[in-house]
From Swiss-Prot:
Ranges for region Acidic: 88-94
GO cellular component term, pick one: host cell plasma membrane
Chain segments annotated as transmembrane: none
Assembly description: Homodimer. Interacts with host CD247/TCRZ; this interaction induces down-regulation of cell surface TCR/CD3 complexes.
Family label: Belongs to the lentivirus primate group Nef protein family.
Annotated localization: Host cell membrane
Domain free text: The N-terminal domain is composed of the N-myristoyl glycine and of a cluster of positively charged amino acids. It is required for inner plasma membrane targeting of Nef.
Designated name of the protein: Protein Nef
Membrane topology field: Lipid-anchor
InterPro entries: HIV-1_Nef_core_sf, HIV_Nef
GO molecular function, one term: GTP binding
Classification of source organism: Viruses, Riboviria, Pararnavirae, Artverviricota, Revtraviricetes
Lipidated sites in chain (N-myristoyl glycine): 2
Region ranges (Mediates dimerization): 138-154
Length: 261
């Protein structure tokens, strides 16, 4: 179904995985060597609240920032259902060249690995300026899982509105609101994804988002600094203060709507 234009839009959406595949082939472990000293200084200057999150390189608190069944120990059936949902949300055209199982041993995302992958993708032009959508979110998860063996439990961003900061310390890609004119929306060069999946209607705040690389996120945990309430009890805030801040931002009301919808 659909005309010629819809096929063009669909094909452009499927190019993301291909672009990420083309970015492979180099090792970026050397990036950590230049960051290690500065990172240590940043950690020493951090407050107790940030230290309590255990953001040191090579450390990871399982379930800390997850939105998958692994957050709370689940049955194997629940995990399989989650993986199947991810696969169902990604078209078969997106899976061209995608291996059935990870090419390397499965591993969790770490601070160092997030830094390396961020620079790796940036230097190959894989995400800069690309419109964000839930579908592309899953494509990125799928790519890193199949090509790098990284369990897809780490990619979360602050709720908005405005700039959405990564909640996993070390991931250097944030989401920024962009203005898209009516003319640009009709221009074929802007059809990186079907409009139904990139329009402001997909975002609860009515914003169109795009990925943007920010190297300062390697030293400044903006998600925690700007929105500690989104980390719940790990923020060091009282339960009442967390509730107050979430209510002031309209996040609790939004969560209630999702439950009733």
């Amino acid at each position: 179904m659909g005309g010629v234009t819809s096929k063009k839009q669909r094909r452009r959406g499927g190019n993301l995985y291909e672009r990420l595949l083309q970015a492979r082939g180099e090792t970026y472990g050397r990036l950590w060597e230049g960051l290690e000293g500065e990172y240590s200084q940043s950690q020493d200057a951090s407050g107790k609240g940030l230290s309590s999150l255990s953001c040191e390189p090579q450390k990871y608190c399982e379930g800390q920032f997850m939105n998958t069944p692994w957050r709370n120990p689940a049955t194997e059936r629940a995990k399989l259902d989650y993986r199947q949902q991810n696969m169902d949300d990604v078209d078969s055209a997106d899976l061209v060249g995608c291996p059935v199982s990870p090419r390397v041993p499965v591993r969790i995302m770490t601070y160092k690995l997030a830094i390396d992958m961020s620079h790796f993708i940036k230097e190959k032009g894989g995400l800069e300026g690309i419109y964000y959508s839930d579908r592309r979110h899953k494509i990125l998860d799928l790519y890193l899982e199949k090509e790098e063996g990284i369990i897809p439990d780490w990619q979360n961003y602050t709720a908005g509105p405005g700039i959405r900061y990564p909640m996993f310390f070390g991931w250097l890609w944030k989401l920024v609101p962009v203005n898209v004119s009516d003319e640009a929306q009709e221009d074929e060069t802007h059809y990186l994804m079907h409009p139904a999946q990139t329009s402001q209607w997909d975002d609860p705040w009515g914003e169109v988002l795009a990925w943007k690389f920010d190297p300062k996120l390697a030293y400044n945990y903006k998600a925690f600094v700007e929105h500690p309430e989104e980390f719940g009890s790990q923020s060091g805030l009282s339960k009442e203060e967390v509730q107050r801040r979430l209510t002031a931002r309209g996040l609790l009301k939004m969560a209630d709507k999702k439950k009733t919808s």
